[in-house]
Amino acid sequence: MPSEAVLGQELLDERRTETRRYKLRFPTREALEASLAIEAVGGAVAVALPERRVISLDVPAAQVSFMAESFEAARQHYGAEIVEDYRYSLEQLDFYNPLAFAPEGEAQQSLDDVIEAIGAPQAWSHSRGEGVVIAIVDTGIDGLRPEFPHYKRHPRSWAANGEDPWTDWQGHGSMCAAIAAGTRSQGGEFDGVAPDAMIMSCRTHFYDTELAAIYDELTSLAREGATVIASNSFGVQSGSPPPVPADSDFIPALDDAIAAGVIVCFSAGNYHHLAGGTPDGHEPNSIWLHKGRSDLLTVGAAKPDGSMWYYSSRGPGQFPGQPLTSPKPDLVGITPPFGRVVYGSNVSVLKDGWGTSGCCPQAAGLIALLQSKRHAEDEPPLSRDQLFDVIRKSSVSLGHHGHSQGAGRLDCEAAVNRI
């Protein structure tokens, strides 16, 4: 297994076994600010959301019992409500397992082949993503990789307190960033779908409060006039419908970002087989929670030969027919078996492809191409609904049920030519 994956597993294990994350919600912002003294008695503030009256604390396992008194004081003196901070799962295909990786010599296709297959090079004569920000909400991005030169890094990239957004604790975020918007311009091995787009690294361990802080920042950028696209490859790893997370700050922050004009893409999930689905089947549903919303784009995974991956989550979504939902997935990207791609600080070969995680940033890159073309032509950006309509109508059907492929495989050239 590549060293970054080993390191990522070690860091994840350390976080799970040595710390716990708690969310404290206060009745007023003043109460929150007055309570921050509790940090000195065992808990370190990971995220502060003053406007939402919330902080989250990392508490070492050995200190949890000692923090009980401080938590009780926060309840009594400041009116705090205290719960464990909900954590989503990284959308990954057991990338911690050495068997998920293959030797370099076994590579069948690479990111270059995928970029060609989805028509990105043909679209570059019209647009390469300039003037658009793609936020990669993931495990961070390895700033040592030449695909991510300094001139492409957004200055408001985000990480929790004490962390660097341009480091990658697992490798997954670097993969997604390279697919969406990597560049060869400074010696990188690959171009992504939108090689001239700005990249905003949003490094997270997928806690609710971290995601809320990220989306609050994206909201601010959009309100300031930036064209922002968010690529998200996290969810709930389950073969059955999960309960809706209680007391979420992420979902209201997501609502605010979408209302401000942030265009949001999500991986459909890698759970079809966990739900008991067969490789060729289009049921049962395994697209969970907010990924069924009509105001975001949900992306599944197909192989280069047009067949569906056995793991790609099928629709129509957890809450079909309810208000503000639509049948999912919206479309699919391509990920090859034994596919060669950036992963952390290395270029690695992944036996079962890159998951729906590797397809979501393809869609984010396509949206960047579309919005960048509008900008270059001095035209206003397309609305969310216009973008989604163009992308769906230009997609190429692979002959599968809509619950598997949505509208089909994205086609960058056809989409750019459609506007």
Which residues are covered by each model-predicted region?
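Autoinhibitory propeptides
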Residues: 3-4, 12, 32-114, 121-122, ...
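Short glycine-/aliphatic-rich beta-strand segments at the starts of folded cytosolic domains
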Residues: 8-26
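Active-site-proximal beta-strand/loop segments in catalytic clefts of secreted hydrolases
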Residues: 26-27, 85-86, 137-140, 179-183, ...
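Anion (oxyanion) recognition and catalysis
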Residues: 39, 76, 128, 255-259, ...
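Subtilisin-like serine protease catalytic core
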Residues: 122-155, 163-210, 225-227, 259, ...
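Extracellular S/T/G-rich loop segment that most often corresponds to the catalytic His/Ser-adjacent loop
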Residues: 138-140, 146, 286-372
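Hydrolase catalytic cores
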Residues: 180, 200-204, 335-405
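Substrate-binding/access-modulating region of protease and related hydrolase catalytic domains
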Residues: 183, 202-295, 326, 345-361, ...
